[in-house]
Design a protein with these regions (language model features):
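Conserved donor-binding/catalytic core segment of Leloir-type glycosyltransferases
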Residues: 16, 209-225, 231-234
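Conserved acidic donor-binding segment of nucleotide-sugar-dependent glycosyltransferases
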Residues: 330-342, 351-357
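Short His-centered aromatic/hydrophobic patch
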Residues: 100-105, 123
């Protein structure tokens, strides 16, 4: 296997990357992606200028320069004005490529982006459509899509998406030509996410029960994540699988409603709401579980949780939504439920737990993740698109 860690067999490039927040302070999928990409490229010899909000003053990696654009809690107009001003004032004299990652903070940069530098937008999701799913007004959705997203996308030379599902959305909803779209999956840091603990050791560290079948899901507690469906599914099978135990990590506006639902379903001794789980404990939680799950109901562009879980040696179950099936189809199609409904989730959980469908081994999970989603390999593919 080719070693991508030390060098990509090419001249060093200077790449400017405009993100959003700072991982792990804001542990969302976009921020994690930008962090891992920039640090993987820097580890291979490139020079990275990373722009974002609330970035720290110091970065131990000498190949990554951090440029703070604004503070996230400032008024929107001020954030956008400062984003443009600070990007313009601290723009490198010479840069080989620019990678944008979030439309809102890319919008004020449009007048000041250099003309002869390739601009690539990494499409992490349809911001307007996600807002609509969370109850945004029709006017708000229209403004986000027409005045922000489409304006930014018209300026970009090419696009990276993490799945065919999001390539379709980018083409159909935003009229981006298919010829400009490159599909490159997300990656996982195999040094952090690896099976280095026994299940018993991991459970002991987290103070989780040793004698239960544990399902783990790290999710934002919002509607489209499908946690209400998952709770219904657990309630359906609890009488037949009394030792089932669900651990939910994450925060969000639905926390009280979900806790109330769990109580009404009689799941207090079978569901644990962990709240915010520090990033350092995430690999431990995956290893402590018998199974991870993503019960998403809509707009799941990739499914990083699935890959992280597999890298830790733990099988992962998903609903047939967005890009998630693209991860698991080539590995174990039985880890995809037949629908998003609670009954389908319950049926597949019961089949897996009762052994009617065998769960992949720890070694098979880790090997599949390492072969297909190693960040160093993914970063190499991204770099090729950025510099084309």
């Amino acid at each position: 296997m080719k070693n991508y860690i030390n060098n990509y067999d090419r001249a060093t490039a200077h790449i400017a990357c405009v993100g959003m927040g700072w991982f792990p302070k804001t542990p969302g999928g976009l921020d994690r992606y930008v962090y891992e990409l920039t640090h993987s490229l820097a580890a291979s010899g490139d020079r990275l200028s990373l722009y974002g909000l609330d970035l720290p003053e110091a970065e131990p990696n000498p190949g990554v320069e951090l440029i703070n654009l604004a503070t996230a809690d400032s008024p929107l107009w001020q954030r956008l004005w400062l984003t443009q001003r600070n990007f313009l004032n601290k723009q490198p004299v010479k840069v080989d490529a620019i990678n944008l990652n979030f439309a809102l903070y890319s919008l004020p940069l449009l007048p000041v982006l250099p003309n002869k530098v390739p601009i690539t937008f990494t499409f992490h999701g349809p911001w307007a459509l996600e807002s609509e799913k969370e109850g945004e007004s029709k006017l708000g959705v229209f403004l986000k899509q027409s005045l922000v997203e489409k304006s930014v996308y018209r300026r970009c030379d090419r696009f990276i998406v993490l799945s065919q599902a999001f390539a379709n959305i980018l083409h159909l909803e935003y009229q981006v030509p298919s010829s400009k779209i490159h599909i490159i999956p997300g990656g996982v840091d195999l040094k952090r996410f690896q099976p280095n603990l026994s299940r018993q050791q991991a459970r002991l560290q987290l103070n989780w029960p040793q004698d239960r079948f544990i399902i783990f899901t790290p999710r934002r507690l919002v509607k489209r994540m499908g946690l209400d469906k998952l709770l219904q599914a657990i309630a359906e099978i609890k009488s037949r699988i009394p030792d089932i135990w669900l651990a939910i990590a994450g925060k969000g506006p639905l926390q009280l409603a979900l806790e109330q639902q769990a109580n009404e379903l009689g799941l207090n001794d079978r569901v644990k709401f962990l709240g915010f789980l520090p990033d350092c404990q995430l690999p431990i939680a995956y290893q402590a579980a018998d199974l991870s799950i993503m019960p998403s109901q809509s707009l799941e562009g990739f499914g990083l949780t699935l890959v992280e879980s597999l890298a830790c040696g733990t099988p992962a179950l998903c609903t047939p939504v967005g890009g998630m099936p693209e991860i698991l189809t080539g590995f174990s199609p039985d880890l995809i439920t037949s629908s998003c409904e609670a009954t389908a989730i319950a049926q597949r959980l019961e089949e897996l737990i009762m052994g009617q469908i065998p769960l992949p081994s720890r070694a098979a999970c880790q090997d599949y993740a390492a072969t297909n989603f190693d960040w160093h390999k993914i970063a190499f593919q991204v770099r090729q698109v950025l510099l084309t």
